[in-house]
Amino acid sequence: MVQQNIDKIISNYLTKNIVFSEENLLATKLSLLDTLGCIYNASTYEDPMRFATRGEYGSNTNPFLVIKDIQSSTEIARYFSILTRWFDYNDTFLAKEWAHPSDNIGTAFGYFFNHKDKNLSEFLQSIIQMYEIQGCLALGTSLNEKGYDHVFYVKLASGVVSVSYTHLTLPTKRSV
């Protein structure tokens, strides 16, 4: 995808008031349920828990209670992404690049866990936006073919959507 002003295109997309269809929301809810299942299943094994927590958060058997002890949104995102990725192999197959939806949902968990004023609808919308941005970028360009890590699209999509939920001005959001 050769596109000038991609930052403006993405920020304009994120500032539009889009009402997602029931089909979009259902697909996102199913993706979220799959993610929760992956997290729970991975938490029953010692290796993924040790890796996800870096051995710092004890032996709590409920993976969703562990995050009470994690202070950073980034660490919460890492924790959930690792546990999900342990079982999630749902890479995209239509794009020129593969992607891991679990990484986007991990970021959403990290952001929304620390922003209790947000609601489930905003959480689901953020996941859809992350998927759409990442998917559109991956449809046109393969970073791996150019020698870059495909995770850049994950980070870009997750980062810009998280920033879009802040109270910063549009020019400030674009500069972040």
Label every PLM stretch briefly:
Residues M1-L168, K173:
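N-terminal core-entry segment
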